Amino acid sequence: MYFQRTLKSDLSCQSVGLHSGRKVNMRIRPASSDEGIILVRTDTRYRQMIRVCLENVTDTTLATTIGSSGAAISTVEHILSALSGMGVDNAIIEVDAPEIPIMDGSALPFVNMLKLVGIRTQEKLKKYLVVKKPVSVSEGESFAMLAPSSSFEITYKIEFDHPLIKEQSYHLKLSDETYEKEICSSRTFGFLKDVEYLQAKGLALGGSLKNAVILDEKRIINKEGLRSHNEFVKHKILDAIGDLSLIGMPIVGHFIAYKSGHKLNSMLVKALLEQQENWTTASFLNCQDAHGQNTREKFSIRDIPARKILGAIHA
């Protein structure tokens, strides 16, 4: 994809908000080149506009929340993931509530709607962020890293003390095709005891078997089961793609994560952008030359403090 892209026409949908339980109406409209992704609260007096960028992240508890001038929109990661995964650079997202509709808990409904209205090429070249040197962040056992690569690669590993999850790892090179085929249908998941606790606190009020995979101590409660045997780690990748879009441009680099989440993903973006010597920008035509070679730079085991990820890197 050499040039920037946006929607061919408007799309609209309605679903509940995962945490509020309220019905949410959302419309996504085309945007001009270099406009980026803009969120708009249509239920506020002045139709508050919020640019999707790291500086506007206000919370990463349970979901990623973007806010500006007193207005905020939460649970943005799935729609941002769909737009990024399908190569959409510019769009205006309008919602009449402080939360993005959860749909079925994955990005598949958004991808299907994008395909239905179509995606068009714009007149300006894309700009890519090219990772030049490894950057990493950690918190406890959790770890996230961006390293040089000649494409956007993702390697992710999770561990849960549950008989149906245990350890899962996945690696892919991201493209429209791999995102649609392998990632976008993976649903958010949670544990019944946690859902009950959150709902007692007035959170996750919209959560149900229609929009999440719910597990008790031994099994999956959803009658239809999983969409893929590794749906859990794939959903974490889906979330990460949305969180990494806070960079504001497509990435040429290798994202490596072990038990990461919204907070750590946001911390990684911040750490990367704060160190200008570790990245540069380039057009698609020359991004492979931005760090002086056409293949991914090698990095040694000592660069990776979370050694448990190594098994996933070579999967």
From Swiss-Prot:
Zn(2+) binds at H78, H235, D239. Its EC number is 3.5.1.108. InterPro entries: Ribosomal_Su5_D2-typ_SF, UDP-acyl_GlcNac_deAcase, UDP-acyl_GlcNac_deAcase_C, UDP-acyl_N-AcGlcN_deAcase_N. Coiled coil: none annotated. The active site is at H262 (proton donor). It catalyses: a UDP-3-O-[(3R)-3-hydroxyacyl]-N-acetyl-alpha-D-glucosamine + H2O = a UDP-3-O-[(3R)-3-hydroxyacyl]-alpha-D-glucosamine + acetate. It comes from the Bacteria. Pfam families: LpxC. GO terms for cellular component: membrane. Catalyzes the hydrolysis of UDP-3-O-myristoyl-N-acetylglucosamine to form UDP-3-O-myristoylglucosamine and acetate, the committed step in lipid A biosynthesis. HAMAP family: LpxC (MF_00388). Belongs to the LpxC family. This is UDP-3-O-acyl-N-acetylglucosamine deacetylase. It comes from Syntrophus aciditrophicus (strain SB).
